[in-house]
C-alpha cells in the first residue's frame, strides 16, 4: 500500500445500518478478503476494539480502516471505510463518518427488513449526496426473505432493488461482487495533491505519549512530517511529527494526500485547541476557506456527575475533557451539590449515551462517579414574563413564581409486527403519546407515528418495546416543538433535610408514584442508625410519601429484674432523650449505592 496512492484508485465509504444488521461482521469480511491483517491476528468484530463494545455487542464509536484491494485485472486500490454505530443515540458518529466519504454501503438484514434506523441513516447519506449501494445481508439464514426485503428497498427507501448486492457477511458469500460494486459505483475523491492543504478533522483521541491524535480526511493538498499546520478555527499552530493511516493500529506513512483518510500527531497537549469539524491547513501557505464543519448537535438528556471522593474533582474534569475529544457530542459545565460537593452537569444524546459515558469514565479513566437521575430541558415561563431553560431540579423556580411550563416533544416512528400492534399501542398510551399516523407497510409490518414527551422515553421505554415485540420492533425519533405540561419538583427529604441530588422534575400525575418508589428504594439502601430516619417525598412543602428506617435499640432494661416500674420508666425516658439529642446532631450518610438505585428505579418506572 503506497503512502500517496493515485487519487483515482482511492475509494472512501462508510457502512451504515440499523443495529444488529451485520455492519461489523461485514467489516470483518472486507478485512479478511484483502488480508489487511495477518490471519493469526484476526478475530470477530475487529473494528469494535473498545472493551465496552464487545461486552454490549454494539458499535459505539465509528472506526476508520485502510485496506488494500487488488481487482481481477491486477489493479491496486486503497479502500478507506468507516464502520459506524447503529443505535439512534450515536447518530452523530454516523454523520461525522459520512462527511469523510464519497459512498455508503446501506446494509439491510434479509430476515428483519428495513427498520427505522435504516431510514434515518438513508436521510443522512442523502444529505451529503453520497453514492448508495444497498447491501442485503444474512441471505444464508433459513428465515431470510430476500424478495420481500427487495420490495421494501424500493417501496420504503426509494432505491432501485436491482442495484442491491446480496451477501452473507458471516460466510463471505458474494462479498467479491460487493468489492466490484465498490470499485465501479463509488466515485474516487476529488482534489489536487498540489493545492493548498485543506483537511477536515472528523475525530480525535488522546494518547498518553503523543498528546491529541487527530483523525483527518484530506480534501486538498498534502500533509507531511515536519510541516507546520494551523487549526483554522483558533489559529493554533503545531509542527507535524507523524502522519499515517488506520489499520487497527496507527501505521505511519510519509504523507497523506488529497483523498486520503488518516491521522496526524503533532504533540498537541492543549486539548481545547482541537475541535471536531475544524479545518487544518498549511501555516506557510494556508487555504482560502475552511471546510463546512458539522452541525453541532444539542444534548437532549442531562445528568450531574460527581466524584465519589470530593478531592478528585479536578481529575474528573481532565477525564471529561479528554473524553469529549473522542466523543464530541457530550457537553459539560461545572455544577455543585450540598450533598455531593463539586461536580459537572453533562448533556447526552440519550440514555444509552449516558450509560456508555459513565462506564467509559470508570474503565478508561479510573473515575468512580455518581450520576444523578437524568432530566430533559424544560422551558419555564415566569409570571414576570421571563423565560428560563431548566434541566436541573436544583435551579427550578418556586411553584408560585411559575406561569406555565413547556416540555420537549418527539415524533416517534415505530415499525412493529402486526401481531403485537395492540400491546405496542397500549405502551405508547401509557407514555402520554398520541397517534398521528398508521401505515401498513406490508401484511406483517406496520409503521406507527406518535408524538410524545421526550421525558417518557428516558426510562424503560425502549426495553419494554423490545420485550413486548420479542425484539422485532424498531424505534426512532426526532425532536419537534415543546408543548404545555403540568410539571412539579419532587424533593426527597432525609430527616427533614432536602437532598438536592435526589430531587426530580416529573409530570404531576406521576409524582406520587415516583416519590413512593424512590423512598422505598432509599429505605433498602440507607443503613440503620441509633436514631430513627425519616425518608420523605414532598412537593412544595407538602409530604406525599414517607418511609422510616427503624433505629437500633439497646435493651436498657436488661439489668432490671423486677423492682419498681418507675425505675424502668426513668431508664426508657433517658434513652429517649439521648436518641433525640443524637438525631439533632447526627448526619445520615447516604451511600453511593443509594444514588445508583434511585437511578435504576427511575429507569424501571
From Swiss-Prot:
Gene3D superfamilies: 3.30.70.240, Elongation factor 4, C-terminal domain (3.30.70.2570), Elongation Factor G (Translational Gtpase), domain 3 (3.30.70.870), P-loop containing nucleotide triphosphate hydrolases (3.40.50.300), Translation factors (2.40.30.10). Its main location: membrane. The keyword Mitochondrion does not apply. One of its GO terms (molecular function) is ribosome binding. The keyword GTP-binding applies. InterPro entries: EF-4, EFG_II, EFG_III/V, EFG_V-like, EFTu-like_2, LepA_C_sf, LepA_CTD, LepA_IV. This is Elongation factor 4.
